[in-house]
Amino acid sequence: MRSGLRIAVGIATAGRPLILAETLVELASQTRLPEAFFVCPAAATDFDASQASQLPFPVHVVKGSRGLPAQRNAIIDAALDFDILMFFDDDFVPAPSYLAEVENCFAAHASVVVATGRLLADGIIGPGIDFAAARATLASYELPKTESPLVNRYNAYGCNMAVRVAPVRANGLRFDENLPLYGWAEDVDFCRQLAIYGRIVENARMTGVHLGVKGGRTSGIRFGYSQIANPYYLWRKGTTRPGGALRQVVRNVGSNVLKSIWPEPWIDRRGRAFGNALGFADLLRGRLHPKRILELK
């Protein structure tokens, strides 16, 4: 039985129209379909509008400035009349029961304001995962029968993040557009804004696979700079713990420096290490800021 909650799905996308098209085929296979789908493409060519008529739910194309936070904000502005806004990355493959589990979670737990799912595989930490492998992984997984599938988390993982819209609407909450382009840690900042209004949880029954597609992402130098600038900015802003920010910086810089000797083919480690160095240099000069990546290549 439906709870009466109205769910919208939102995807901000850039440079991956074929991936998005296949992701939408998976979304159309949900056992519980969304009331609406909002897509914010960075460019007109990033979404094939002809696909909209083939999908079993209303499709709305919204316009926003290029960059994940800005595009997601455009989606929020368009979806404020819904109860739950489900953010997916354009390369996230949800299990067929995903949205049904989202509805169950938010209907049963009024204190939950953000829920993220359990990743069965994440291509970000490797060369990437294709759709066939993602489907096979999902098909072979048995959902846990535990009565308490929720675990409290500091933040959700932005590739699959369900948000209760009421506190967002009531308090004018938005993603921070000072974190440009790919965003990087924008999910942490947004979740910590919401944390004062309720629980942030991981739900073991909301499952999916993040393909980790490499195309359409930020350059290594820019990404490396963001690995320094964004944690520092969020620490100064007060939406991340200083210890957590420091551990994140140390871990990322260490990985980039050590692995730049024999880098993985799918990661520009040397570019990232150079971006890290630029970030530290700007910190010493007193001009470290996330938006500086717009001046880098």
Identify what each model region corresponds to.
Residues A156-V163, P167-G172, E177-M206:
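A short, conserved alpha-helix in the catalytic core of glycosyltransferases
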Residues R222-N230, T240-K297:
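Non-catalytic, C-terminal membrane-associated alpha-helical segments of glycosyltransferases
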Residues L24-K63:
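Acidic donor-binding segment of Leloir-type glycosyltransferases
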Residues Y182, R199-I221, N230-L234:
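Active-site donor/metal-binding and catalytic loop motifs
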Residues I11, G15-S29:
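Short, well-formed alpha-helical segments that are part of the catalytic scaffolds
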Residues G117, A134-Y154:
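Short, flexible, basic/aromatic active-site loop/helix in glycosyltransferases
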Residues S97-D130:
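Conserved donor NDP-sugar-binding/catalytic core segment of glycosyltransferases
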